[in-house]
Amino acid sequence: IFMSKIKKINSAKIILPSIVLFFTVVLLLSLPVLLNYNSIQNIIEKKVSSEFKINLKILDDISLKIFPRPHYLVKKANIDLNIENDNSSIIETNNLRIFIPYTKIYSKSNITIKEIELENANIYFKIDDVLDFRNHLYYKINKPIHIKNSKFFFLDKNNKTIFISPIKKINYSINKKSNSKELKIKGNIFDIKYD
């Protein structure tokens, strides 16, 4: 009888703090979601420009999502590879994720960006942009950019579409073993699949 009372007391001592700890963690992770992140639009744009060497123009609301990994979700944005040339290629996206560490979910001024992910983007690329893209490959950037389920539009000098290529996935990152940049593309051109 005495042993069964001890087991009941011990299990209550474990279960109750576990429940309190669980709800405390959920509450702490949920609080930043309620804040307004449109005020840090300029900070995010400058940080992306300095760390990824791309021009980001946020066109719609910014929100913070905690799961599955903490990230800022930008509903609509334009991205440009050449910071100095306004006529360079543009990527239009309706779903831009900017991933941040868990330790920075409360920070609005000291933002750390781990990687960027674009989904359902339209990539407009001209023959003149090949040089901009090649130059971008030489920048010392070690944070990955991922593009998923997007369309690549190749344009002529008059901005008329020559062809459209669906892209399943693009991974643009540094291979840490060989210390070189990698560009992995999965999609198809003229019904020919490429990896």
Give the ranges of each region predicted by the language model.
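N-terminal type II signal-anchor transmembrane helix
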Residues: 2-53
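A short, amphipathic edge element
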Residues: 54-60
